[in-house]
Design a protein with these regions (language model features):
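Conserved Rossmann-like nucleotide-cofactor binding loop
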Residues: 2
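Alpha/beta-hydrolase-fold catalytic nucleophile elbow
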Residues: 69
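A short SAM/SAH-binding and catalytic strip from SAM-dependent methyltransferases
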Residues: 34-48
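Substrate-binding/catalytic lobe of Class I Rossmann-like enzymes that use SAM or dcSAM, i.e.
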Residues: 72-182
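Hydrophobic/aromatic anchor residues within beta-strands of the central parallel beta-sheet
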Residues: 16-20, 66
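A short glycine-rich, Lys/Arg-flanked "PGG" loop and its adjoining helix->strand segment in the class I
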Residues: 50-65
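A short acidic, Gly/Pro-enriched loop at the edge of an enzyme's catalytic core
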Residues: 23-36
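Conserved SAM-binding loop
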Residues: 7-8
Length: 182
């Protein structure tokens, strides 16, 4: 909800105001000029990848495009990851699942969504995670006053460090895929 409000506030004074909705993607109807999905693909989990891409295909107008930003992992790392849940799947995003870059593209292709451009930015995302970690440490006393305990802090310290390490060592990537209907 706070991201929704932020987006609504940002577009408030535009001449042409885009439609921004807070809705379960599976309930979305109509046809759109574009679809933008930011770090949601990995949250739906592999069980729902088909319905995710099917929905994108169904709501795009002819010649429309979709931009999907998602976190992926190397193919080698994925081969073990899909068998043994990691820290993030266990404690942060139960049910979520990352794909490899090629698996993401293959899954999109099943629904006639062709990847026409990929932009990767793992190193800058590692810096973002470092900044989030620093801000979390600075804000901890305020967060603790809201009732969060030391276990919560350790979990988030681990999560932010774990992710940063994955981006720095090349196991994780954050990418934006520009897709069009074939």
């Amino acid at each position: 909800p706070s991201q929704f409000k932020f987006a609504k506030d940002r577009i408030e004074n535009l001449e042409t105001v885009p439609d921004i909705e807070l809705i379960d993607y599976r309930l979305l109807e109509g046809k759109f000029d574009a679809v933008v999905s930011i770090e949601m693909f990995e949250a739906v989990g592999s069980e729902y990848w088909n319905s995710y891409f099917q929905k994108i295909q169904n709501v795009l107008k002819p010649n429309a495009k979709a931009v999907i930003q998602t976190i992926t992992m190397t193919k080698d790392y994925f081969e073990g990851y899909d068998k043994w849940p990691d820290f993030i799947q266990t404690y942060i995003f139960p049910g979520g699942e990352l794909a490899s870059d090629q698996l993401f593209i293959d899954e999109a292709n099943k629904f006639d969504l062709e990847n026409i451009k990929t932009t990767n930015f793992a190193k800058s995302y590692a810096k973002t995670l470092e900044t989030w970690y620093e801000n979390f440490q600075i804000a901890w006393s305020d967060i603790e006053e809201m009732g969060f305990d030391a276990k919560f802090k350790r979990t988030w310290d681990m999560y932010l460090a774990y992710c940063r390490g994955g981006f720095l060592n090349g196991q994780l990537e954050v990418s934006q895929y520009l897709l069009k209907v074939k």
